[in-house]
Amino acid sequence: MKGGILIVILGILCWVPVATAQEKPRDAEKLGNVHFPVSCLPATQPQFDRAVAMLHSFWYPQGLNAFAEIAKTDPSCAMVYWGIAISRRANPMVGAPGAGPDALKDAVEAAGKARLAGAKTQRERDYIAAIETYYNDWEKRDYRTRVLAYEKAMEDVYLHYPEDPEAAVFYALAIDEAVNVLPPDPNFARQQKAGAILEKVLAANPEHPGALHYLIHAYDFPQLADRGLAAARQYGDVAPAAPHALHMPSHTYSMLGMWPESIKANQAALSVSKGYAHALDFMVYAYLQMAQDIEAKRGVDRNIELLKSQGAAGAAAANPTGAVLAGYTALAAIPARYAIERGAWTEAAGLQPVHSTPVADSITYFARAMGSARSGNLDAARKNIEQLKQIEEGLLQVKDDYWAQQVEIQRNAAIAWTAYAEGKKDAATKLMRTAADLEDGSEKHVAMENRLWPMRELLGDLLLEVNEPGLALKEYEASLQLARNRYRGFYGAAKAAQRSGDPGKARIYYDKLVVLCSKADTQRPELAEAKKYLAQK
């Protein structure tokens, strides 16, 4: 992009790799290539570009502080107050309820200052009016209404200034945000629209951090993830100063089952943001898929230390993007994944809830219910199912329909496996299929990017248990289309093929499992079984 400047933070930062804890020097840090022209003091322009670059990588509160510093030296710069206002929005990808009352009040004040400061160009006045559209009457208008109004306002800015790449990038982000408040679209029309806009920006400026970041979000769905791979491979190198830029590529890597790449990305993120539980969750999940249980356990232990040293609220708040819910869910998901992925049912049954948020607690109660049902403690399973029911009802009362449905899915699955343990096979398979169908009809949330347990895979597990290997194979293969390169998916598909009389397909899936776990640090029984099968002539 002509006229752009390369945003560089001077200085050398030592980083701590997760596994070795040895310090190594990082290169001079960058935030990407951003140029957002403003009619302010000449000295303000590079500072403003730097602050916008931080904003594009969701680097809170550093970006907010950067705008605030500009306001001290150039208080007549209207757009700096726009920057403060938009930075107060909270992470736009997390969804409802959005920013809290205090942040909203501060944002309204900043937007008002932006308007009263008298922006010198119509373009600047249009940006300010757009963000005011988001905040106006926030006490009376719900989050969804404000998000959609802002999307329309940014569309108008984008159409009025077709040569302004920042208008394009912020409009694409508004589209991405609107996806979270609308029903799932099987055609992904909005996501593809945002992606097309961002791809055009990247063609002119390949190192624009916002275009790279929001493109990954636009394609952050299993059906689209391949299209975000090029951006994922580039983003961390373009803006390594921002912890989220180092982590964000792992969204794509997880969707595609690229576990070594996910681990590398999250090691980098954790090296600069050591309390980043969301990144730690991704890393533990990736290790578990490759049967690197010793490495995964280190992540579990690190999670325990985060909780001990900071408490749930402090550890969740350490998320550098401000996505506190993603922190809470990560803290609960890490030990749950460690038990479930290893089939350690008694361990899963004994997990203790952190009692942070209902959404996070539901993860623990679901794992406890499944662990109890699979280990034969049906009374405990029923008690945990009741806890899930109470959480679901509470979420419905506050009109949090999305998360209420996610808990409903968990509850149906837990009831299904409890019913199976009671000998009610037909009821069990019916309920489990309901859970799988419900999950297929909903989208994953960035606060739980890697779903704890793909329900269609879990349906395959149940069908194997009730001696329907042919049907089980169909479900495993369907699950692997969306949850790629999963250890339990490959093993289940291999076992189902073997038991349904398809040795060729069984060999294919056992081989995939062995290749996936070529660097395993633990000899899991399923892996030993796969190697034994493949050794047969």
Roles of regions detected by a PLM:
Residues 458-528:
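C-terminal structured "cap/appendage" subdomains that terminate the fold
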Residues 4-16:
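Bacterial N-terminal signal peptides
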Residues 78, 85, 89, 99-116, ...:
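TPR/TPR-like (Sel1-like) alpha-helical repeat modules
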Residues 373-376, 405-436, 453-469, 479, ...:
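C-terminal substrate/ligand-recognition segments
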Residues 56, 90, 177, 221, ...:
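Register position in tetratricopeptide repeats
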Residues 22-77, 81-163, 170-207, 212-226, ...:
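Short coil/linker segments at helix-helix boundaries
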